[in-house]
Amino acid sequence: MDRIAEAFVWPVRDPDWLTKILIIGLINVIPIVGAINGLGWMLASMDRLRSGEEKLAPANFSYLGRGARVFVVYLIYGLALVALGLLPYIPAIAIAVSQNHTNGNAGLIGLALLLNLVAFAIFTLGSLLLTFMLPALILATDRGGIAAGLRVGDVLRRSTANPMNTLIAGLMLIAASFVSSLGVIACFVGVFFTAAYALAMQAWIIRSFEIGSAAPKAG
């Protein structure tokens, strides 16, 4: 429980946390560039955690290069998931469109529904899988570059080496995503703040995963 709580509260230990969060939040508004810089800032904040300094990285535009690698890798994984989901979805739509309301074939309509369910399952389960793989994926990319992040086997091996560690990290990332969305729920008033705060949380979560995956198993 302490591990979970720390992810939420560690950013405020930095005396300048509010200013840094707001600046990164404003930078995040810039399409694509903001997201890339935010990822790099998250990694730089994680570096500070590695050094034992519980302070957020300075808020500026200096993290584009580092964040770009993670952005590219995650984009490739996302596009692969979309392509996989479209394999059953496109035939489902084609079959459904080919059936008119008066002379539709019940078997074909049933097949279209089944294919739609398969596509939905692929998108849903694939998104969850990506979430739970994210800590290992980010660490691999940050250390070894884009090629390392795309070594699916290595990423999966690290993710499954300590299932409980991966489960906790994945659930915490889902919680961080919820925090990020709170600004949208509040009519976009706090979206700048909550999105950047979620990035700070992710730095702690991924660092915590890194420590857990490096620790030797008992027994």
PLM features per residue range, with description:
Residues D2-P15, E53-A68, L150-T160:
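A short amphipathic helical element positioned immediately N-terminal to and/or at the very start
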Residues N28-R50, G107-G149, S177-K217:
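Selective recognition of hydrophobic, aromatic-rich stretches within alpha-helical transmembrane segments
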